[in-house]
Amino acid sequence: NNKFLDITLKNDNNNKKKYLEIYSDLPRPLLSEYNFFKGLIGGTLTFSSVIELTETNSKLTIENFKIKNAPGLVKLLSLADFGGLADLAEGEGLSFEKLEMIMNNNKGFLKLEELYAVGPSISVLMEGYKESNGLISLRGTLVPAKNLNKFISKIPVIGKIVIPKDVGEGLFGVSFKIKGMPGEVKTTINPIKTL
């Protein structure tokens, strides 16, 4: 099958830190405990983490993957009235070119400092936290049709005024909030947001 998994752990005894690095072209089993990654297909994963006594700072990157039959994402797309994308997510899956996630874990409090995922049909920006008791609180923006926004950004004057330079940001989006305890998570949508 020619799948690879490379794990490196280095100790820095002077600074009381450990450095963990993981590379794999089979990311799904490594992320199976996280609901957010249910339905992940394919992709290559790079994960790096600096582990201190009570705190861990990590960065996760996944490239060239699909999300298929992920209930949370399908629900979010349906609530946002992106019906066609919800159907695609349930059918052949939504493609993404890149996902990057930066997080900090301090004594069981997980802070998602930034998550962005960029794909040809939709991009996602998100931040939030998960408490040690299981409570999650996330907020973010869904931006459909990256290609349309790319097209507009190429119009010299309009593009500079309207389109921010950040990856994943576009002209029109939908803001969302996800909050609650496991099994009682509520999702709310703000239907139209101009970024």
Q: What role is predicted for each listed range?
A:
Residues 1-179:
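Small-residue helix/turn framework positions
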Residues 183-195:
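Gram-negative outer-membrane assembly/targeting C-terminal domains
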